[in-house]
């Protein structure tokens, strides 16, 4: 997994993949310096302007890297977050969570060990989005009974995604 020696998040280096479509561009640009301030190195995989693009083309970039273990976590942003959620959750080992509030942010990590955070750029305001990201990054997976539930999801993945 890539590491950067110049950044530190909670005492360890972390890179996080970041991508959006045109509906999430403004929020993505707002989150990049915020992530750096938290000590996280954002790996920006586009889009790079507000021209209309297809969200699957950008969701796949992050989901593939997280699925393969090349990135530990990712953040995807589109207008509502729904499209990016649909794309990301097509990949094995991806637990993408569409989050619009702080409670869901915490629970997506604590209970579901979400590895991709999805935000609706036209739904969530910039300041709330920053709080959501901070809570999401700072919340560890609780394990315990939640681990057993994730193991059931992993078993379903293995059974249903054999091809």
Write out the residue ranges for each language-model feature:
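A short beta-strand-loop structural module common to alpha/beta enzyme folds
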Residues: 41-52
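Helix-adjacent hinge/juxtasegments
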Residues: 58-98
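C-terminal binding/interaction regions
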Residues: 17-19, 23-24, 102-163
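Short, Lys/Arg-enriched N-terminal segments with co-localized hydrophobic residues
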Residues: 3-13
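Glycine-rich phosphate/diphosphate-binding loop of Rossmann-like nucleotide-binding domains
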Residues: 18-38, 42
């Amino acid at each position: 997994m890539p590491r950067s020696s110049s950044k530190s998040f909670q005492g360890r280096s972390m890179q996080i993949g970041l991508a959006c479509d045109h509906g999430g561009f403004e929020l993505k640009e707002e989150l990049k310096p915020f992530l750096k301030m938290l000590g996280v190195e954002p790996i920006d995989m586009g889009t790079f302007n507000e021209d209309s693009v297809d969200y699957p083309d950008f969701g796949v970039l992050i989901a593939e890297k997280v699925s393969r273990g090349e990135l530990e976590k990712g953040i995807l942003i589109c207008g509502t977050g729904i499209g990016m959620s649909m794309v990301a959750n097509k990949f094995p080992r991806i637990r993408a969570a569409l989050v619009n509030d702080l409670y869901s942010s915490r629970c997506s990590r604590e209970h579901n060990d979400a590895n991709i955070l999805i935000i609706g750029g036209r739904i969530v305001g910039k300041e709330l989005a920053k709080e959501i990201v901070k809570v999401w990054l700072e919340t560890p997976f609780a394990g315990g009974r939640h681990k057993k539930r994730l193991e059931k999801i992993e078993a379903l993945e293995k059974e249903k995604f054999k091809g």
